[in-house]
From Swiss-Prot:
Catalysed reaction, written as an equation: carbamoyl phosphate + L-ornithine = L-citrulline + phosphate + H(+)
Family: Belongs to the aspartate/ornithine carbamoyltransferase superfamily. OTCase family.
Task of the protein: Reversibly catalyzes the transfer of the carbamoyl group from carbamoyl phosphate (CP) to the N(epsilon) atom of ornithine (ORN) to produce L-citrulline.
Positions annotated to bind carbamoyl phosphate: S51, T52, R53, T54, Q78, R102, H129, P130, V131, Q132, C261, L262, R289
Protein's UniProt keywords contain Transferase: yes
InterPro entries: Asp/Orn_carbamoyltranf_P-bd (IPR006132), Asp/Orn_carbamoylTrfase (IPR006130), Asp/Orn_carbamoylTrfase_sf (IPR036901), Asp_carbamoyltransf_Asp/Orn-bd (IPR006131), Orn/put_carbamltrans (IPR002292), OTCase_ArgI (IPR024904)
NCBIfam families: orni_carb_tr, PRK00779.1
Lineage, uppermost ranks: Bacteria, Pseudomonadati, Campylobacterota, Epsilonproteobacteria, Campylobacterales
Compartments (UniProt record): Cytoplasm
Organism: Campylobacter curvus (strain 525.92)
Family annotation (HAMAP family): OTCase
This protein's GO CC annotations: cytoplasm
Protein name: Ornithine carbamoyltransferase
Pathway info: Amino-acid degradation; L-arginine degradation via ADI pathway; carbamoyl phosphate from L-arginine: step 2/2
Amino acid sequence: MRHFLTLDDFSKDEILQMINLAGKIKKEAKVREFKPYLKDQTLAMIFEKSSTRTRVSFEVGMYQLGGHALFLSANDLQIGRGEPIKDTARVISSMCDMAMLRVNRHETLEEFAKFSQNPVINGLSDKFHPVQLMADYLTMRERGSGEKIAYIGDGNNMAHSWLMLASKLGLELRIATPKGYEPDAKILEKAQQNAKISGAKIYLSNEPKEAVSGADVVTTDTWVSMGQEAQKEKRLREFAGFCVDENLMSLAAKNAIFLHCLPAYRGYEVSEAVFEAHADEIFAEAQNRLHAQKGVMVWLNDKR
């Protein structure tokens, strides 16, 4: 049995297997051919943090795969009253076939997976957002993008996930953050170790122009994530100059695409003009959450 907590847990071949499976299932969905890969199975969806795309994509995905999704907020569970994570994991995994968690702390996810009888999927944690990266890479493949990626902004869970994807698949990744907002040192070190095997190229700087120059893919994330509202004014000051605007985007490769995991805050991490110019790519990326996650779930089910 396998869990899907971080892309670092998988080989290049395994990641591509999931991507290829997602592409196959997406083609079937386009002609309304929904095969019951997960017939009569139940996915428990546990949300400590709210989300539009995560809930809708997993719930619709399970329905299209012949299964059922059960939504559970922290208020619906005894976790909110102090029940140990390990006990909740034991109970839920005895009744549900798979679990997806969107949590504040990655350690919560790891504890749940440790005591779960069935596969556990990371729907988002403070350290990683791997399902989003599966959608992003599926979008890159569909668009025929090159493999030079520029990530501009906060060295957060999205930056960490790009580090894992790039280092596993042998991509070139350039990350530009303000000083003091670099990716976690241990995660960066692991990515650099992976890169020695895969041939990936990883660069860090504090200069957005340097990162974007010649990039095939430009991506960013919100400067103020959920739970960081008290830091908003400070962050907005320190991220000045890191907005992906027309001038910055003009430095990328001629046919470069722009990706954003959403929600986007126009005028902050991305300008209105850049967002609207690349809206087709961004919303294709959002829809690919549905297809990429179906690929992940079916793959995990096959590995029991």
